[in-house]
Amino acid sequence: MASITRQAYAEMFGPTVGDRLRLADTALVIEIEKDHTIYGEEVKFGGGKVIRDGMGQSQRMAADCADTVITNAVIIDHWGIVKADIAIKNGLIAGIGKAGNPDMQPGVTIVIGPGTEIIAGEGMIVTAGGIDTHIHFICPQQIDEALTSGVTTMIGGGTGPATGTFATTVTPGPWHMERMLQAVDGYPMNIGLLGKGNASQAAPLREQIAAGAIGLKLHEDWGSTPAAIDCCLGVADETDTQVAIHTDTLNEGGFVEATVAAFKGRTIHTYHTEGAGGGHAPDIIKVCGEANVLPSSTNPTRPYTVNTLDEHLDMLMVCHHLDASIAEDIAFAESRIRRETIAAEDVLHDLGAFSMISSDSQAMGRVGEVVLRTWQTAHKMKVQRGSLPGDNARHDNFRVKRYVAKYTINPARTHGIAHVVGSVEVGKLADLVLWRPAFFGVKPSLILKGGSIASAAMGDPNASIPTPQPVHYRPMFAGQGSGVAAASLTFVSQAAQQAGVADRYGLRKRTVAVENCRSVSKRDMVHNDWQPDISVDPETYQVVADGQLLTCEPATELPMAQRYFLF
């Protein structure tokens, strides 16, 4: 039998079972768990290669073939780290397996035909498009920035650079909801908007859900009182929508116990649950142990570094309209920034108690760094805490699955969109991101929206080949013309979908209703479902979880940083 060295095989067809990859310049290493391709029957495109007429390409009609095949890719997702060919059909993931010509090859599960396009995935990593659930829609340019970082779904609120939007992720009222849904209709990004949840009467909240909001946002700047919390969650239960909350930093309406009591066991997504981004000082972090609380972080505290505290004070003054000349405003800012709880947040992520990571875009967060800071946190914890149970000296597969879930499947489940996005699984929208391993988490090579390429690192358009400098991100065809509407989704409430808001507003994108928002709980947070009993010392701010002190040192140096951004 003919043989080939492992190195030569990896160079030709990409890594296979037992091969390992380093992620960017981190300390994280993955090992391929399974290879769905067949040795000796791999497909590859190019001169003298396999995918040619009568060889790896069949004669079958387009209806029986994939529209696009990504060949020999390494998939990283919450369910596994595998090598496979990926089929895309009608904008959806149609297969994960072995591609080729079933008339010539054994074991083919994905048919390549004359109507099939090929994307070479050899040596590449494929992940699901990221989901950022904490967006202040302050400027539309955020969408391009997020897309080129590997994010394909944005959830939040706002109306542009209005004072309310600078501070809160809220698109308030039916009129603003209609205008914003119309505005985002032209962008290659899946988008869902949150209405204002701060009201003590239900009617103003119901009308926002009916207008298209996929959920409601409670924010302390609008008054996150127990009465508002109770009312908002009641409307959410009626309409099967999610509630996100930024709790009461100053403890004016009650302490954290009063807020938890107002939840009444109902599901809620707690933003920046550590507290630097806002929330009951100093112990909002305790809520991550509640079964009905779905806790997330925003990325400025990810991970804890020697610069974290200083930059937060300046950010806070701007984002929450505070005045440095007013002593009470300074005290408010300083009460939110605590090194002890930020350090504990790192550890709680590594142990799976914090379930999600998001941005807080332009409002104490960086919209293009959700993916990057997730992996920086994973690296820091690997270096400081060693391997997790389930991992070993060869690989960090479990830790990688835990962290990728924080910006893919878990936010999708939280906001009722996991039936269409959030993972690399058959039947879901083909929102896929391709990475060279050396640039993983930092700079993707291709971003697919609904099976079409929406953005890519592209060279000089006037060059004779695609690679000459300057190479930078450029919009591709899925972000142009009518292709935008075909490749992306607008998420709305079930009530809005039934009322036909898409036609009423003149939307071109397909609208999809959120579902199962009220039945989701902490136990549904994949690899991130730990519910510790947490206490915070009111004087030292030390965090103890199930009797264990949680702390770590700030990082003085991180991977995925300067060496990737010289130009």
Curated annotation (Swiss-Prot):
A cellular component annotation (GO) from this entry: cytoplasm
Amino acids binding Ni(2+) 1: H134, H136, K217, D360
Residues the record marks as active site: H320
Record keywords: Cytoplasm, Hydrolase, Metal-binding, Nickel
Molecular function per GO: nickel cation binding; urease activity
Quaternary structure annotation from Swiss-Prot or TrEMBL: Heterotrimer of UreA (gamma), UreB (beta) and UreC (alpha) subunits. Three heterotrimers associate to form the active enzyme.
Protein's name according to its UniProt entry: Urease subunit alpha
Organism expressing this protein natively: Delftia acidovorans (strain DSM 14801 / SPH-1)
